[in-house]
Design a protein with these regions (language model features):
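Conserved N-terminal beta-strand and adjoining loop/helix that marks the start
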Residues: 1-16, 38
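Conserved hydrophobic "DFG−1" position in protein kinase catalytic cores
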Residues: 9-10, 17, 88, 103
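Short, glycine/serine-rich, charged loops/turns that create anion-binding
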Residues: 14, 22, 71
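A conserved beta-turn-beta hairpin within the catalytic core of GNAT-like acetyltransferases
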Residues: 24-30
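The catalytic Nudix box helix
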Residues: 34-66, 105
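Active-site-adjacent beta-strand/loop module that shapes the phosphate/pyrophosphate-binding cleft
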Residues: 60-62, 69-93, 102, 108
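NUDIX/MutT-family hydrolases
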Residues: 83-85, 94-126
Length: 131
């Protein structure tokens, strides 16, 4: 099982979503996800989150708290995702490994098909946003 740290970054009521690049054998290619990535040996999940956001987005983030942990089984891999609420502390996100980035409002989320592992968290956000 691969350990993944993912950042939930908000700005003005919007969530940052990233579109995955097309890669052979990647069942999430072309879908949208929260930024983050795989933990390296000996690395804490918080350090993983900071490193992945720096490498993939060119930004500094501060992990604030664990929002949720989920396990998902893809055809090619089983992952355990730890979603952190994170504060953007330096830089402006840029798509270094993704094909696109978007700051999406809740009413726009349906326009962005997300990876199956991220879908439950996005649905919970939708419930929180509904009066």
């Amino acid at each position: 099982m691969k350990e993944i740290a993912a950042a939930v970054i908000r700005r003005d009521g919007r969530l940052l979503l990233c579109r995955r690049a097309e890669r052979p054998g990647d069942s999430c290619a072309g879908l949208w996800e929260f930024p983050g990535g795989k933990r390296e040996p000996g690395e804490s999940l918080e350090d993983c989150l900071v490193r992945e956001c720096r490498e993939e987005l060119g930004v500094q983030v501060k992990p604030l708290r664990v929002r949720e942990q989920l396990t998902h089984i893809y055809p090619e891999i089983t992952v355990r995702l730890t979603f952190f609420d994170a504060e953007l502390t330096g830089g402006e996100p840029e798509a270094r490994v993704h094909t696109a980035l978007v700051w999406a409002l809740p009413e726009e989320w349906d326009r962005y098909p997300v990876c199956p592992a991220d879908r439950p968290l996005l649905e919970r956000f939708r419930e929180e946003e509904t009066p």
